[in-house]
A protein has these predicted regions:
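Cytochrome P450 heme-thiolate monooxygenase catalytic core
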Residues: 1-4, 18-19, 38-215, 231, ...
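C-terminal helix/juxtamembrane-tail motif
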Residues: 172-175, 294-295, 366, 382-400
Length: 400
């Protein structure tokens, strides 16, 4: 499948060994340089949130607001600016709408177990599921045309003699390719334009789907649990009290909101099947011998819905993440970003996005179901990640 879709085992999600180590180390370094966990990245997210809330203000008091779409544009612009240096606005919105639709088609097609299995045997897929094969092939070409076009445009403008810091991921990677080719030592095999295109694929896919879906699930859960929504608003009114922009400095003073986000991540359990791993040595678990190099799938959902760890796991209860003093408490088993050396590369970015977007959304707006007599369903749309069934809402400004 990798040979068909990627042109080899490339990118960061499905690679291993030295190639994976080099890519992860480089990506983490770039994210740190971009200010991940510091106010540089925070400011970029806040700039996008200002545009997001200004758009929502125009939707206020209308009969219907497509909030999930607003989330997708906001998150998509953050990811795109980090990767390619521009946000989605004006005519670029049509570009985003096209590729987001393409991404959804791809995510949903790959959840079909027959297609997922036959994708490993492309000759069978090509002739047994011709339509699915053509869809995958079309998606592959369109995505890589887009990523390669971004790389080519960056190459035209790249000044390798400039001492300025790179402004986006593609620029940083192209500089690394140049240095690897210049210095030799074997690194030139790890940093190539083909590998860069696949890194863009992994980061764009992962950054888009997970954060946007979590935001959509959070609003869905709160619409269906108005008492939780009321407590979130009460905390925001007590701590913030105005429509000012909420920043990361406010985070420690908003434990109930943080607990609500944690509970949303737990309930959403975005990955129905986690990424494949393999054992690096022989191991025995609960009496079962598993030899080295066995493919395994760690199921985080089994932990997130474990009744011993999370009593009444089907209930939406943010209080489970608070201690008796109302302070946020750490639950070791809560691991929505996975654990270990292959845990989510963008965890810091995702946490920052979720808090800043939701804090400012709930502080500035009241959110209601479009039809109070028919609440949005909890039925999920299957895919590589779970997605809520699309819903619209009504919103009102909280501070006039």
């Amino acid at each position: 499948m990798d040979n068909f879709f990627r042109g080899g085992t490339l990118g960061i999600v499905f690679t291993e060994g030295e190639l994976w180590q080099h890519q992860r180390r480089f990506a983490l370094s770039v994210l740190r340089n971009f200010g991940m966990g510091r106010n540089l990245m925070e400011q970029k997210i806040l700039d996008e949130i200002v545009a997001f809330t200004e758009t929502l203000s125009k939707d206020a008091n209308e009969t219907s607001c497509d909030l999930p779409w607003r989330f997708e544009v906001c998150v998509g612009s953050i990811i795109n600016a980090m990767l390619f240096g521009y946000r989605f606005e004006g005519e670029k919105l049509n570009e985003f709408k096209f590729f987001k639709s393409l991404l959804s088609d791809h995510m949903h097609s790959m959840v079909n177990p027959c297609i997922a299995i036959l994708a490993q045997e492309l000759d069978l897929l090509k002739y047994v599921f011709r339509g699915s094969y053509k869809l995958l092939d079309r998606n592959r070409k369109l995505f890589f045309d887009f990523f390669n076009r971004q790389i080519e445009e960056h190459e035209k403008e790249l000044d390798l003699n400039s001492s300025d810091e790179p402004t986006d991921f593609v620029e940083a990677y192209l500089r690394e390719i140049y240095l690897a080719e210049k210095n030799g030592g074997g690194n030139e095999t790890y940093f190539t334009k083909k590998q860069l295109a696949n890194m863009c694929l992994d980061l764009w896919f992962a950054g888009m789907e997970t954060s946007a879906n979590t935001l959509e699930f959070t609003v869905l859960y709160l619409i269906r649990n108005p008492k939780v929504m009321k407590k979130v608003h009460e905390e925001l009114d007590r701590v913030i009290g105005t429509s000012r922009l909420i920043t990361l400095k406010d985070k420690c003073n908003l434990p109930y909101l943080q607990a609500t986000i944690n509970e949303s991540q737990r309930m959403a359990n975005l990955l129905p099947l986690n990424l494949l791993h393999k054992t690096t040595r022989d191991v025995t678990i609960l009496g079962h011998f598993i030899p080295k190099n066995t493919c395994i799938v760690p199921q985080i959902g089994n932990v997130l819905f474990n009744e011993t760890i999370f009593p009444e796991p089907e209930m939406f209860k943010p209080e489970r993440f608070l201690n008796e003093n109302g302070e946020l408490k750490k639950i070791e088993e809560f691991c929505p970003f996975s654990i270990g050396k292959r845990q989510c590369l963008g965890e810091s970015l995702a946490k920052m996005e979720l808090f800043l977007i939701l804090a400012n959304l709930f502080n500035q707006f009241e959110i209601f179901p479009k039809d109070p007599k028919h609440l949005p369903t909890l039925r999920r749309v299957p895919g590589i990640t779970w997605q809520p069934t699309h819903y619209n809402v009504k919103i009102e400004k909280r501070h006039v």
